Each structure stands twice: as structure tokens, then as C-alpha cells.
């Protein structure tokens, strides 16, 4: 990959995809980004699950609002350095971890994204097969597991979605922006129509905003509200960590904050309310409560409605997979060897890897997920803490953009051999605490708060170590 290097930039740190980009995105593009992230089969199931915790509807709404407002605050904080420097998440990681040490947080996030990319694609393809069998029941013979644990029909569905997602990604960030700009509203339109149909069939009197037979009260209810709040924050932690991959394109932080407001508290609350109306109504309409939107659509006695509904939710899955699990590893893997791996090549590495991990086997083995994804996820909280403390408290919101691409020993972010060992020292113990919480039965009560624990400890350890070791901060003269 040959391209003109700006003066002083190292080919080991720079390619055009990682360098500063034109900033043309408006608040609506950020709003659409969050719509694509929220409007998915996974988001639908997650939103419905919050109303099945045994809480009164107003208690669930309090938890929803509290959790999503925390996410909004974090997203605003994470967005600023990337918007300020117009560079993606792995490049911003060089501030805290060093120009080469940044590969540690980048690869961690990339591996998590690869696994979830495969799982999301598999889940969407499985739901799509339900629709296919609705129209072609004779194909059920091809739905039995055959090769590598997946059926012929399963492979057809998985690879079809895989190719569709790869095609959208390959077209570039501008095409991705255009795709997510309309994908979110399309899903909303289908959901509103579906909710209206459900209410018409079930009757408003049969719609309940509580999806659980149990009912909590007193301190039990209060504790569950806190748990629900933590679950919301944890659910959004992945895409929020690499939100800079998108905020880098935004015209201003004012646009980012406005887009985050409409895309997070307003959008998530509206989506959750429509979701619970649909899920609640499936019981009187179909005789059982359905938590999968495509399964719900497939039960409608209208072929055109089934096709439109399936199209909308497949579109939603493509949207979330691209914004949360495709763009991220593309930048992350390109950051490892910029002169050899372009953004497109990084994305295709992730896409191909998602096949070889056979996500259907991973998803169907909860113990395997527990020992792989949960360990990787234990890194996310500490990474938030370290990156935010470094930018806001250590570096005082100052970034020397040119130094982010300088691998000379005198470079501002070169530290020790290109690695800031202070950040690594802070990351490891904070992560070990998260792993201990996840895998120690006696600490299971804290498992839902692992993100908060990791974020606090990662930030605290880094702050103490950085001040003790007097890590250099950029001078006031650099861009801020």
C-alpha cells in the first residue's frame, strides 16, 4: 500500500484511514448512528428483558433513563478527543498507551467486535431462516446441522448476510453514513406499524408494561432498579468505547452532543416503549409471549407484511453490525500495521475471522462465551477509566496530533520503546479484579457492576501511577 506520508509521520503509524479526516457529519448522522446501534434484534430482546425484572413500569423507566443518561455522558466524554483530532479510537489510544502500546487496547476491542460480529450475523440469519421456512416449509430437510455444526440452510443464511454486510462496508465510510441515515428510520416505521397492528388485534386493555409474573417491592425493587441501570450502561459499553471512530467525522462537539441526546435517551426510551407494547401484545394475539421480533413478524397472516418486517430487521442487524462490530476492528487491525493493512483490509480480516470462530458453536456453548467474551469484556471498563483520566486529567484535553504518528524516541507519545508501561500497569490489576468478579461465585452479586468497578479502578490506578512517575503531558501550545 503506497501513499504520500506527511512530513515527520512514520509508515509504522500512519495510513490515510488512520490520519485526520474531513469533518462533515452533522448531529443527525450521530443520531442515525445510535438508531442503528439500538434498533436490532439484540436491542429489542434487551429492551424487553428490562420490563421482565419484576419492576413496576415507572421503575423500569427510571432505570432506563438513569442508565442511558450515564451512557450519554460517557459518549460525550469519549467523543471529544477523536472529534478534536479527527482520528479514530486506536490512534487516540496512543495518548495513554504510547504509539505502539495502543495496539493493546485496539486489539482487545477488535477481538470482542469480531466475536460479536459473528454472533449477531448468526442470530439474524437464524431468524431469517424462520421466515424462509414460513414460505418454503419443504426446505426444513436442509435445516438439520451438517457441516461444522451448521445446516445447509444455516450456511446459506449466514453467508448471505455476511456478503451483504461486507458489501456495505466495502463501499466506504460515506456509504456507511448514507446507509445508517435511513436504516434507523426504516426500522422505526416497521415497528410503529407492527405495534399498531398488535394493539388493534389485542386491544389496548390487554397491553401491559410489565412482562414478568413476579412483582418486587421495597428494597428488592430498589436494588433491581440499580441493577437495571448498570445493565443499560454495560450493554452500550462496547460501541461507546470506540465511539471516536465516528465522532471524528463530526463538525463540532455541539453536533456530537445534540446527536447523542436524540440518539440515546430520546431514541432508546421510545424504542423500549414500542418494544414492550409489541412483546406484551404477542401473548393475547398469538397465545405466547414472543421476544424475537422476526419470530413475531413471521406469525402475521400476511406474506407482504412478513417480507417487509424481515427486510426491516435484517437491515437493522446489518446496521448495528457495521457500526458496532465492523468499523471498529477495521481501524483496530489497521492500527497494528498501517503500511500493510488498510481500513478495508482490516475490516475483511475481521469478517473472515468471524467465520472461522464458528459463532453458532460459540453462541450455543454458554460456558465458552463465559470464558472468552467475558474475560475480554473485563478489559473494557478499565480501558474507559484509563483513556478518560489520561485525556481529561493528565493531558488536560491537549493533543499533539502530529506526535500521534511520530515513532522517533524523542516523540511526545513514544514513552519507553513506544509503550507507556504506566497504562499497562494500571490496566492489568483493574482487569484482574473484573475477571475475579465474573468468575468467583461469592462475588456474583457484583457481576452486573463489573464495568463500573473496572472503570473506577483503571482510572484510579492510572492517575496514581502517572502522577507518581510524572508522565509527560503535552504543552499548552498544541491543538486543543
What are the language-model segments listed below?
Residues 108, 119-125, 156-198, 211, ...:
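Membrane-interface loop-to-helix entry segments
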Residues 63-97, 109-112, 116-122, 278-282, ...:
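Juxtamembrane transmembrane-helix boundary signature
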Residues 121, 125-134, 186-213, 235-236, ...:
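Hydrophobic alpha-helical segments and their helix-loop junctions in multi-pass secondary transporters
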Residues 1-57, 72, 191-201, 216-229, ...:
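Membrane-interface "cap" regions at the ends of multi-pass membrane proteins
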Amino acid at each position: 500500500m503506497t501513499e504520500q506520508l506527511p512530513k515527520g509521520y512514520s509508515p509504522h503509524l500512519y495510513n490515510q484511514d488512520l490520519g485526520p479526516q474531513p469533518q462533515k457529519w452533522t448531529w443527525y448522522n450521530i443520531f442515525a448512528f445510535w438508531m442503528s446501534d439500538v434498533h436490532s434484534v439484540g436491542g429489542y430482546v434487551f429492551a424487553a428483558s428490562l420490563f421482565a425484572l419484576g419492576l413496576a413500569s415507572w421503575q423500569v423507566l427510571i432505570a432506563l433513563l438513569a442508565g442511558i443518561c450515564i451512557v450519554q455522558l460517557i459518549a460525550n466524554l469519549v467523543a471529544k478527543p477523536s472529534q478534536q483530532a479527527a482520528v479514530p479510537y486506536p490512534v487516540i489510544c496512543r495518548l495513554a498507551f504510547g504509539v505502539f502500546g495502543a495496539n493493546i487496547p485496539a486489539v482487545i476491542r477488535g477481538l470482542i467486535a469480531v466475536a460479536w460480529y459473528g454472533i449477531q450475523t448468526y442470530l439474524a440469519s437464524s431468524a431469517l431462516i424462520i421466515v424462509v421456512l414460513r414460505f418454503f416449509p419443504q426446505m426444513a430437510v436442509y435445516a438439520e446441522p451438517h457441516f461444522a455444526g451448521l445446516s445447509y440452510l444455516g450456511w446459506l443464511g449466514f453467508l448471505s448476510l455476511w456478503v451483504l454486510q461486507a458489501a456495505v462496508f466495502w463501499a466506504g465510510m460515506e456509504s456507511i453514513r448514507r446507509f445508517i441515515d435511513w436504516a434507523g428510520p426504516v426500522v422505526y416505521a416497521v415497528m410503529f406499524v407492527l405495534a399498531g397492528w398488535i394493539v388493534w388485534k389485542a386491544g389496548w386493555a390487554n397491553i401491559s408494561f410489565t412482562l414478568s409474573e413476579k412483582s418486587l417491592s421495597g428494597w428488592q425493587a430498589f436494588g433491581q432498579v440499580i441493577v437495571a441501570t448498570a445493565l443499560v450502561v454495560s450493554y452500550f459499553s462496547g460501541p461507546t468505547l470506540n465511539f471516536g471512530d465516528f465522532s471524528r467525522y463530526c463538525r463540532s462537539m455541539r453536533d456530537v452532543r445534540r446527536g447523542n441526546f436524540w440518539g440515546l435517551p430520546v431514541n432508546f426510551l421510545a424504542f423500549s416503549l414500542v418494544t414492550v407494547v409489541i412483546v406484551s401484545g404477542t401473548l393475547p394475539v398469538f397465545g405466547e409471549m414472543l421476544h424475537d421480533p422476526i419470530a413475531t413478524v413471521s406469525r402475521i397472516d400476511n406474506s407482504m407484511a412478513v417480507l417487509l418486517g424481515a427486510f426491516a430487521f435484517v437491515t437493522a442487524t446489518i446496521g448495528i453490525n457495521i457500526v458496532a462490530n465492523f468499523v471498529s476492528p477495521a481501524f483496530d487491525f489497521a492500527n497494528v500495521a498501517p503500511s500493510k493493512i488498510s481500513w478495508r483490509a482490516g475490516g475483511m480480516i475481521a469478517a473472515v475471522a468471524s467465520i472461522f470462530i464458528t459463532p453458532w458453536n460459540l453462541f450455543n456453548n454458554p460456558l465458552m462465551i463465559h470464558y472468552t467474551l467475558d474475560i475480554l469484556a473485563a478489559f473494557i471498563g478499565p480501558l474507559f477509566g484509563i483513556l478518560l483520566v489520561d485525556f481529561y486529567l493528565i493531558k488536560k484535553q491537549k493533543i499533539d496530533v502530529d506526535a500521534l504518528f511520530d515513532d522517533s524516541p524523542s516523540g511526545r507519545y513514544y514513552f519507553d520503546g513506544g509503550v507507556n508501561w504506566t497504562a499497562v500497569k494500571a490496566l492489568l490489576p483493574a482487569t484482574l479484579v473484573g475477571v475475579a468478579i465474573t468468575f468467583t461465585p461469592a462475588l456474583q452479586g457484583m457481576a452486573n457492576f463489573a464495568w463500573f468497578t473496572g472503570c473506577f479502578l483503571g482510572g484510579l490506578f492510572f492517575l496514581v501511577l502517572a502522577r507518581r512517575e510524572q508522565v509527560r503531558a503535552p504543552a499548552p501550545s498544541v491543538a486543543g
